[in-house]
From Swiss-Prot:
Subunit: The Tat system comprises two distinct complexes: a TatABC complex, containing multiple copies of TatA, TatB and TatC subunits, and a separate TatA complex, containing only TatA subunits. Substrates initially bind to the TatABC complex, which probably triggers association of the separate TatA complex to form the active translocon.
Membrane protein topology class: Single-pass membrane protein
Species, as recorded: Psychrobacter arcticus (strain DSM 17307 / VKM B-2377 / 273-4)
GO molecular function list: protein transmembrane transporter activity
Protein name: Sec-independent protein translocase protein TatB
Keyword Ribosomal protein applies: no
HAMAP family: TatB
Gene from which the chain derives: tatB
């Protein structure tokens, strides 16, 4: 920190040894080291605080610049919005003026048409000898048009029926189709299995039946024994 070399330290040590003596030199060196450590700590803290302040100042400057940019863009957007509103108002005003002029131009024409219609209605109607002929002509024209449309529709239906080919059958009958049934379907569809006694497994329970079926003499002996008892 102070740019002190080894020779300077050696010179300071010799001078302190001469001035203080060998007894007070260790204590003086200890106190000097403590003071040196305190000075280093204070210097480091001051340096860190100064750097933090500088960083804060830089960040503040950057924030101020960004805020200035944001405010500038906001002012530009407001100006553009004001211009758009002014143009919209001008367009609406021009449209209203055009509508007013068109209404003013159409009103005298409508009045003239109404006046001519009123005059025509006030005039007496002249009798025309071709009234019945015109009605007959219109009726004959309607009938001819109906005949033509019916002929065309019949032709269209005939052509459509002729052009439609026979569609092949896509579905197949359910022949030779087998399905595997589950437990639920088996329980619902199949009947219950009849119970048959297992003579081989239940030997003790069915021993009398086996002996009776095996020899009729044994059955007779058993009957006689029961009677004697």
């Amino acid at each position: 920190m102070f740019d002190i070399g080894f020779s300077e330290l050696l010179l300071f040590g010799v001078i302190a040894l001469i001035v203080l003596g060998p007894e007070k030199l260790p204590q003086a060196a200890r106190t000097a080291g403590q003071w040196y450590a305190k000075i280093r700590r204070t210097v480091s803290t001051l340096q860190s605080e100064i750097e933090a302040e500088l960083d804060l100042a830089e960040t503040r400057q950057l924030m101020q610049k960004e805020l200035a940019k944001i405010r500038q863009t906001e002012a530009e957007m407001r100006r553009e919005m004001a211009e758009m509103r002014g143009s919209i108002k001008e367009f609406e005003h021009s449209q209203s003026q055009n509508l007013k002029t068109s209404d003013k131009a159409a009103s005298p024409a409508n009045q003239a048409n109404n006046d001519s219609a009123i005059q025509n209605n006030n005039e007496p109607a002249t009798f025309s000898y071709a009234y019945g002929q015109s009605n007959n002509l219109t009726d004959s024209q309607q009938l001819s048009n109906q005949d033509i449309t019916s002929i065309n529709s019949d032709a269209v239906t005939d052509s459509s029926t002729i052009k439609q080919p026979a569609q092949p059958l896509i579905t197949k009958p359910w022949e030779n189709m087998w399905f595997r049934l589950g437990a639920y379907d088996k329980a619902r569809r199949l009947p219950a299995v009849p119970y048959l006694p297992n003579y081989k497994a239940d030997i003790l329970l069915n021993s009398s039946f086996d002996s009776s079926f095996d020899s009729p003499l044994n059955t007779q002996a058993s009957v006689n024994q029961q009677e004697s008892e």
